[in-house]
Every structure is written in C-alpha cells, then in structure tokens.
Amino acid sequence: MAEAQNDPLLPGYSFNAHLVAGLTPIEANGYLDFFIDRPLGMKGYILNLTIRGQGVVKNQGREFVCRPGDILLFPPGEIHHYGRHPEAREWYHQWVYFRPRAYWHEWLNWPSIFANTGFFRPDEAHQPHFSDLFGQIINAGQGEGRYSELLAINLLEQLLLRRMEAINESLHPPMDNRVREACQYISDHLADSNFDIASVAQHVCLSPSRLSHLFRQQLGISVLSWREDQRISQAKLLLSTTRMPIATVGRNVGFDDQLYFSRVFKKCTGASPSEFRAGCEEKVNDVAVKLS
C-alpha cells in the first residue's frame, strides 16, 4: 500500500480538510519546478496570490501570466494547470485551499480570466494588506492550537470581505474632502437668507465653478438643489418635533417670507407646513391610542 503524501506542495496530497494553506517557492530547476495538473480540479476552492516572479495558468489552449499582486480563485471542478512561467527564474505564490461557509456564496463570485477561474488584483495601496492577510491565514492554518483552523477560516473570511470592500470603494470612491467641508458649511448656514455659492467656494478654497462641478460629480445634484433638500429636511424635523411657529421654522432654514416658505415646502413635500405638522400629530396620537 502506497504511503500517504503529507506534503501539500507535492502531488498526491489529499487536501482532506476544511482549510489548508501554504507558500510554494518555485525556483527554476528546483524540486518544485513542475506543473500542477488536475484536469478535474478539486472538491474545494483554492486562492492563489503571486508574491514573486511569474507563473502561468493554462486552460484549454488559453494562458494567463500571473504577476506579483495577482490573486486567482479556482472554484470546485475548475481545471488546475499551472506552474512557473518558462521565462521567469522563480514563481513564489501563497495559496489557501478551503471549503467555504454557505453564506460566502456572494463573496466567491469573481470576474473570470477564462472558464471559471476568478481574478482580482488589489490596487497598489491595498496589496500589502492582502499579502499580510494571506500570511496570517498560512500561519494560523499551520498552527497546532485548538482554534487554529477556526482562526484561519476567520482570517480568510476577512480577506474575502476586504475584497468586497475594495470593490465597493472603487465603485463608490470616498467623497472629496472639499465637498464634505462644503456640505458641512451649508448645513451650518441653513438660516442664512443671503446664501450664495461664492461664499461656500471661498470657504473651501475653490472657485464657484469648480465647486459646482465637483458637487455634481460626487453627489449627482447641484449645490443649490442639495441645500434646498437640507432646508426642507430640517424644516420637517422642526415641524414634527417642536411647537415652533411656522414663520420661525421658515426663518430657521433661510426663508424670511412665510408664504414663500409654505409654497416651496408644499412643492417639495406635497403638503403645506401646517398640513405636514397636523399629519405628524395624527400619527403620534394613533400610536398613543394603540399603546393605551
């Protein structure tokens, strides 16, 4: 009977575990310098991060060159045919074999380079963090402690979530600090009936045209439209939570003329200030009756 292979870097290892992780340091003509060839793939997933040199992944006549920072995801049943690129002196890659938790499904839906082989490349700022997480997973996965495997799985979950977070940031980049400061300035000056864009632009050291462009680019609406939304929101809050006279509410949000305030409020909400307040009071009374 053949002796079981205990080295996960060599052919024949069973990978009969929830998580196995390691580093494969392939040097030209070294003992690990051969192509992995699993035409039927594996039962679990494998994540592969290139950290040095170059590797090449082959799949039915197509090839992909792995460079430092590239992360590949091989799902169950996907062809595994990869090794050191023939023109590279080395290919060092960290890897994690795992069987996922059921709720990870969405996090494992990666864009593919071909067939079902997933690909993700963090931007330069995030690459050290992903490499560090891989290292922590490997250390925990190779540990002998009672909770080592659970810790490794927890770190892997963090890595998958970090990828989701990085993708979300790329789709929704953080707000420009100048736009954020402009929003704060506008919110602090809602009662200013002499408001103009120039004063906001001066506060954040931009020209009015540049501020208007950035505002629309980041928030999708104009400065004046955003301010009006804030004024109406604040007016609704004051009408629903205080007994402040309607004229005073209007002045608190920059309307000196009560009739004009009422017109604008009704246009935005479909109800006059007095109707809106009455509706809020009715809802409060209904809740009080139900609780009594």
Curated annotation (Swiss-Prot):
Q: Does the keyword Repressor apply?
A: yes
Summary of activators and inhibitors of this protein: Arabinose converts the repressor form of AraC to the activator form to regulate the araBAD promoter. In the absence of arabinose, AraC binds to the araO2 and araI1 half-sites in the promoter region of the araBAD operon, leading to the formation of a DNA loop that blocks access of RNA polymerase to the promoter. In the presence of arabinose and the cyclic AMP receptor protein (CRP), it binds to the adjacent half-sites araI1 and araI2, leading to the binding of RNA polymerase to the promoter region and transcription of the araBAD operon.
Q: What triggers or suppresses the expression of this protein? A: Negatively autoregulated. Autoregulation is either greatly reduced or nonexistent immediately after the addition of L-arabinose. Transcription is stimulated by CRP in the presence of cAMP.
Report the subcellular localization. Cytoplasm
- Could you tell me the Gene Ontology terms of the biological process aspect for this record? arabinose catabolic process
Domain of life from the UniProt record = Bacteria
The record's subunit annotation is: Homodimer.
* The protein's name in its UniProt record: Arabinose operon regulatory protein
Q: What is the protein's species of origin?
A: Escherichia coli (strain K12)
